[in-house]
Curated annotation (Swiss-Prot):
Its cofactor is [4Fe-4S] cluster. GO terms for cellular component: cytosol. It catalyses: 5-amino-1-(5-phospho-beta-D-ribosyl)imidazole + S-adenosyl-L-methionine = 4-amino-2-methyl-5-(phosphooxymethyl)pyrimidine + CO + 5'-deoxyadenosine + formate + L-methionine + 3 H(+). Binds 1 [4Fe-4S] cluster per subunit. The cluster is coordinated with 3 cysteines and an exchangeable S-adenosyl-L-methionine. Its EC number is 4.1.99.17. It comes from Anaplasma marginale (strain St. Maries). Homodimer. Keywords: 4Fe-4S, Iron, Iron-sulfur, Lyase, Metal-binding, S-adenosyl-L-methionine, Thiamine biosynthesis, Zinc. The lineage of its organism: Bacteria, Pseudomonadati, Pseudomonadota, Alphaproteobacteria, Rickettsiales. One of its GO terms (biological process) is thiamine diphosphate biosynthetic process. This is Phosphomethylpyrimidine synthase.
Amino acid sequence: MDYSGVYPSSSKVYVRGNLYSDVNVGMRKVAIKNGTSEFLVYDTGGPYTDREAKLDIKSGIRKLRSTWIENRRDTSPVQRSFVPSGSSCTRYQKAAENVLRKIAGGSPVTQLFYAQNGIITPEMEYVAIRENALRMQVGSSETGAAAHQEITPEFVRQEIAAGRAIIPANINHPESEPMVIGRNFLVKINANIGNSAVLSGIEEEVKKMALAVAYGADTVMDLSTGSDIHNIREWIIRNSPVPIGTVPIYQALNKVKGVVENLSFEVFKETIIEQAEQGVDYFTIHAGVLKDYIKHARGRVTGIVSRGGAIMAQWCLAHNKENFLYTHFDEICEIMGSYDVAFSLGDGLRPGSIDDANDEAQFLELKTLGELVKVAWHHGCQVMVEGPGHVPMHLIKENMEKQLHLCSEAPFYTLGPLTTDIAPGYDHITSAIGAAMIGWYGTAMLCYVTPKEHLGLPNIDDVKAGVISYKIAAHAADLAKGNPSAYARDYALSQARFDFRWYDQFNLSLDPLTAKSLHDESLPGKGGKTANFCSMCGPKFCSMKLSKELVDQ
């Protein structure tokens, strides 16, 4: 699973911190031929984009944050509450030797708690260095998102303390390389993986994760609903350099053999403790699906399309009781604060079709999520809020404006949104359009959609298509927000294009191998890579060639 080859002419370099000597931030250096000694880009690939790294799925990857966590002296080693079993566990026993830690005192062990108490953690310095790649001074954008000359560790601390940003960083996932989610930082993307009752297994899902992070996924969600959920998640976490998210209600339902009526808070509590001990960095919790809101979704074209939302709605109606995720929310906060698991407050009533966008059910839930944001903050927990869904372009901005107002500027994390319903097989495109727009307006993280959306379980090629589509959307949003590092890369590639430096164009792109292979189809070999034209226009009609001749005159 070495993906360093997907970036020819690139190498991994490490930038050392100033506040903490053991902070070394991995970035990718692209070699280009115009005399520039280095071009650094943000890199999410961890060891998978490092040619020098030794990879072994059975051992897991390096535990980058172990010393930082131990040095804070607010956690201690404990025994697992849940002991994994099964053949897959035996096969990967080395990775299972991860030391389990839990809160040792009375205060939360969260990045929010540290930030609010004036502490700049190594994680905060790490993300400041990552965000600073190629930044230069620009003003703030019209959307209100700050584009600062420099992202300092103190600025990161302030954003975390205010709740405008989060660093998902479970104390039991020391392998993760810290990253920040907030609208005053680079727009991030998430890739969903996971098995179903029909398809996939451990090796396949770990390969999907590795490919996703190599191509730029900032976080990965394991949405497994089939068999062996615990062990699949274990090997994903032990091998993941990015934060891992889950929807715990899926495994809780699996524990009661798929019978929604048999769910209980006790089963759910056991599940989130199990997953927190493994190292899951954020949980999607559908606590805003209240019993009285369900009736508002009955007249929709597509009803309730969130799996978690539908599960909780069915449970509420079966028992004629309020959602137990809502009634036990304080206890959930206490558990999550003990491991620094961040909340991703799920939009269980999100619209699943254009006709249902921005309806009463959606915004009633959003108001409740805003109230729960404050409860989570009160407990010292980090929190972001999930959003739609299926929304036509003219209604997208309203979603961002309402979320900022109702949720006190907690980071927004949206699935797309898909801007039309007519393109099954191409929903990575329909959704990337909406994702670029809502990212521009202020969404902090975009959940990818693959070509298989609405059609089936994504395979590894679908994962790549989804990641690349959303890297484009996030980058377009960063450009619109005035982020200087986004402009720097566009400028460098445009220069290479005008100079007919074909290899530099390929290597500065999001997917160099694909760019080169498409060029090779018509102009293969060394001659094609020195030509001052491409097969579209040929040597006589190339506008850039003609323009360059004018400049040279």
